Amino acid sequence: MADSSPQLAKLRSLMKERKVHVYVIPSEDSHSSEYIAACDARREFISGFTGSAGCAIVTLEAAALATDGRYFNQAAKQLDGNWTLLKQGLQDVPTWQEWAASQSAGGKIVAVDPSLLPGSAAKKLNDQVRKAGGADLVPLDENIVDIAWGDSRPERPCQPVSVLPDELAGKPVATKIEELRQELAKKNCPGFFVSMLDEVAWLFNLRGSDIPYNPVFFSYATITPETAILYVDESKLDDSCRAHLRENNVQVKPYDSFLPDARHLHTEVKTKRQAGGDGVVIGNFLISNKASWAMSRALGGDGSVEEMRSPVGDAKAVKNETEMNGMRACHVRDGAALIEFFAWLEDQLVDKKIMIDEVQAADKLEQLRSKQQHFVGLSFPTISSTGANAAIIHYGPEKGSCATIDAGSVYLCDSGAQYRDGTTDTTRTLHFGKPSDAEKKAYTLVLKGLIGLDTAVFPKGTTGFALDCLARQHLWKNGLDYRHGTGHGVGSYLNVHEGPIGIGTRVQYTEVPLAPGNVLSNEPGYYEDGNFGIRIENIMMVREVQTEHCFGDKSYLGFEHVTMVPYCQSLIERDMLTADEKAWLNAYNDEVLKNTRGFFEGDDLTMSWLTRETRPVE
């Protein structure tokens, strides 16, 4: 772990100059991105913690880092003695908001960069701070972490943007904009402001590479009843992008002019309301509930702005037939790359006795993926983990310090790729030797949970929250569980983690029912710290299913899995499976063999491994 004292000293000096006692440093950028560019990794810079989720709070005397169960082990290793780790979700552990508020008693000032915190989150934090005896939450428009970072802060990326043609996107830009305007008309809304990068990319059928692993670009958008404006650094756009936007009547303005334009539009609409008399009805501006406090303030705040779940995000989460066909196709190709990789890895470790470390394995997998049609890059850093490292849920192997893969231990590989026709995310846990009874039992309990969720049939209107227990039920019966969600939404050649849908216990998963066209992961797991970790993950699509009856005139839904990679035969405890589970597993194996064997003509090594791992489970 690196010493965080120098950067904390610089930050505290800046806090004192501004009479700030508590400074909040979220993980996200000004677009609420989960994955961020290096220039926006402020929480990592100040704390040394590299996980994708968490919040740092620095006072003049103390510092705390809050994160969720995926990152408890990682944070404990990366944080130095300056930091207190707040394990979110555990009993008697305060939330980061509660901890920040507790430091504000006596009228102390709590501050945050308003571009990094959603307006709703800022309001909640302000309420807690005031209740604890602090002053009103202060929006500091200058980010003092950036000042402390100084010249060593990386430059903001400015990568080229490309057009995603309709034959891959499945829906023209004009149609998407018109459907959004129809939603705005229902509320007499003068404008909707799009801040999430994947929503901008989806809305305009454009892709970029400003943020690693995510085909997005720094941008905002404004949609009014008359205009559509894309705010982006124009140097990113080539002639084809400009023509594409012109054809769809989209104006282009500089990225940095977004907030000034929002302030101007607020003033303009306010004037129209005042001049229009009783007959003029103009609703509030609409922004996403993830839009920044800075955006809300620019548009006039309470009384002028209505926060809501983004209608763009909702539309994006329901894939069209073109996108679903792309997801099917890219997962077959991706599965072929994984099958070839696992066969190669076993041959290296077991037959040839060659030492392979976690990073070398991840690099080999990326090389095999890169040969597949439409490959663009990875969708997240590959989690290549052996033995005890597999118990670190979001483990990140580092070159030079990672472990050598032990053929006698569990190996967990969670990986994915971006293809122009879809996004993949697959986890398989393997053992290249003789697994222990405990490992086999844990693996089979996890597999049973995956099958239970995959085969679920449920009425339309059911949420992911309601289905979560299907994946955990067999672990629960044994007093076991896992500290992460069961499923997240997946983008179509977009972010591998996509809202608003998911399967888990988060409150947000109670709000949005699953719908045909949703694409989600199914990834139960089990982890023993210091020993081993098990996770199995498939991607599946929500589809309508035919049932014998139709109670209440409701339609019923189920899942179609698209991941095509075998499970580890040596880790399956067959006596723990029911006849139905064995039948499902054998049907899945037949499906994998049928869809992928054509990739391995002349490749006896891979074909032998595939045949063995898809053999019937008796």
Swiss-Prot record:
- GO CC term, one of those recorded: cytoplasm
Q: Which GO molecular function annotation, any one, does this entry have? A: metalloaminopeptidase activity
Query: Which EC numbers characterise this protein's activity in its record?
Result: 3.4.11.9
Q: Which cofactor does it need?
A: Mn(2+)
Listed under catalytic activity are: Release of any N-terminal amino acid, including proline, that is linked to proline, even from a dipeptide or tripeptide
Its Gene Ontology biological processes? proteolysis
Q: Which gene is transcribed and translated to give this protein?
A: AMPP
Q: Does the keyword Metal-binding apply?
A: yes
* InterPro entries hit by this protein: Creatin/AminoP/Spt16_N, Creatinase/aminopeptidase-like, Creatinase_N, Pept_M24, Pept_M24B, Peptidase_M24_C, Peptidase_M24B_aminopep-P_CS, X-Pro_aminopeptidase_P
Q: What does this protein do?
A: Catalyzes the removal of a penultimate prolyl residue from the N-termini of peptides.
Q: What family does the Swiss-Prot or TrEMBL record give for this protein? A: Belongs to the peptidase M24B family.
Q: Tell me the protein's name.
A: Probable Xaa-Pro aminopeptidase P
**Which CDD domains does the entry link to?**
APP (cd01085)
